[in-house]
């Protein structure tokens, strides 16, 4: 799956339609998706998601995983859902986004991220 949003992102956007190219069973299909198809509000833009450095990126990721930044959580759910779908862990993109949303809202994504941090601190140096 290759995606490109109409607002210039190289990922599925919460602020515009996204063009999708998908290779499945030897056939390439192209189609457009929009946030509303997944029950996600379409934002006027992605300005609130812009970051300037690694620290801001980490802060926004933590906010998304903790559901403290709705826009960040929703763009993570859309793109993680696409990864779940591409990994053949669900029937379609809608189910992938639903699963990603469930994992985010349950706190499991936050828990796994915390475990990753702990693991890397144990193995560092």
Please place each PLM-identified region on the residue numbering.
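Glycine-rich anion-binding loops and their surrounding alpha/beta cores
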Residues: 1-125
